[in-house]
UniProtKB/Swiss-Prot annotation:
Catalyzed reactions: 1D-myo-inositol 3-phosphate + UDP-N-acetyl-alpha-D-glucosamine = 1D-myo-inositol 2-acetamido-2-deoxy-alpha-D-glucopyranoside 3-phosphate + UDP + H(+)
Family as reported in the entry's similarity comment: Belongs to the glycosyltransferase group 1 family. MshA subfamily.
Positions with a binding annotation for 1D-myo-inositol 3-phosphate: 48, 59-64, 117, 150, 174, 194
Subunit structure: Homodimer.
Species name: Streptomyces griseus subsp. griseus (strain JCM 4626 / CBS 651.72 / NBRC 13350 / KCC S-0626 / ISP 5235)
Gene name for this UniProt entry: mshA
One GO term of the biological process aspect: mycothiol biosynthetic process
Protein name: D-inositol 3-phosphate glycosyltransferase
Coiled-coil boundaries: none
Amino acid sequence: MPRSRRTDEVSQYVSRLGSTRTAARLRFPGGFSGASRKPRRVAMLSVHTSPLHQPGTGDAGGMNVYIVELAKRLAAINIEVEIFTRATTGSLAPTVELAPGVLVRHVDAGPYEGLAKEELPAQLCAFTHGVMQAWAGQRPGYYDLVHSHYWLSGQVGWLAAQRWGVPLVHAMHTMAKVKNAALAEGDTPEPAARVIGETQIVNASDRLIANTAEEADELVRFYDADPAAVAVVHPGVNLDRFRPFPQGSDELRPGNAPSGRAAARARLGLPQDALIPLFAGRIQPLKAPDVLLRAVAVLLDRDPSLRSRIVVPVVGGPSGSGLAKPEGLQKLAARLGIADVVRFHPPVGQERLADWFRAASVLVMPSYSESFGLVAIEAQATGTPVVAAAVGGLPVAVRDGVGGFLVQGHEPEAYARALGRFADAPELVERMGAAAAAHAQSFGWDTAASATADVYTAALSDHRRRARAHHG
């Protein structure tokens, strides 16, 4: 299909936004040099989704967990965090203390309800106004640094950081060009306006935080990011919450994962001897829950005897663009002849989610794109292996053949083969689950917060150096 004139104009504009830079090797936290002073207080921006929202509902997902856990751990090392997010109901207090040292500030920007994420760019001016109003009531130098999450927040952070004279650290979480390169069937491409906005943010940021080395490479390759300004910080997992037994249990002993799984199944009303492949996440084409259902249909065609001992829970709610909704999946399950083994459940809180992970034989993540895939680490921390698409950050989160299996592509037959290995050798669940739990131990949020603080320190040091050079 020939490119439109409009597409060419956008491409030329994006090209002009990026400067030509010589390739340099990527430098990560620990490799930065500069003064050692870390910030006292950070303004964290999350325009489109509140850290108070339950993950798995609407646009709330892994990013919400990321912001909450990171902010708490930063506060624990004496970096105060104030999170600005859009108010979605009039009953919200202007400020909410999320934890000691962590404050959530609600900003009025557009109607409380009925505003899709795709409509939020029109409200960025109002959101920025609210952020500036909050800042105006503080003493000079109140915020040492701005840390924005997702491109909408990056646009606000760009202006705020310049106005306050502080550095901007940005985390993309997802990128338009990367998503558009791997669209699921029925999904809607990200608009050119987002590509332009992300390119602007890359050039405006003092530091960019990537979840994995692959994401860092994508920032350089797709957006011409300065490699020296990109830092890799792996997200973490709440190891107190996601463990083979609930927190406070007296059964937290090595080798007890099987009894932990049995206890979780009893709490959730699941059969003890069943193969339970779990999908947990937002129901949208990007996450590809339909691939799991199709794979189960293939598996049952090959081995009809499995029907009496398989349960497929789908835990999550609708989100984003495309056609994937719970009712759509229910109809698909009926067409595939597997409605009797698939169970749909609404999104649940983190404690309950941990129980679903414990109960599962395997977590299935057939996503088309994942910057990291927090739920993969969370499930493994509970002692549950993962079958995931070999995309984005999932090869970092999942060690292929050790704590689960990575699948190339999205063909249901390939996922059916992976699930069949667990059906044929049930002991694989416990063996891989133990390896998965050991792997997850290296992804604590304390480590992520410490590395993020190093990025902040480097950004502050460079910012001061440039300011001194500018003023002679």
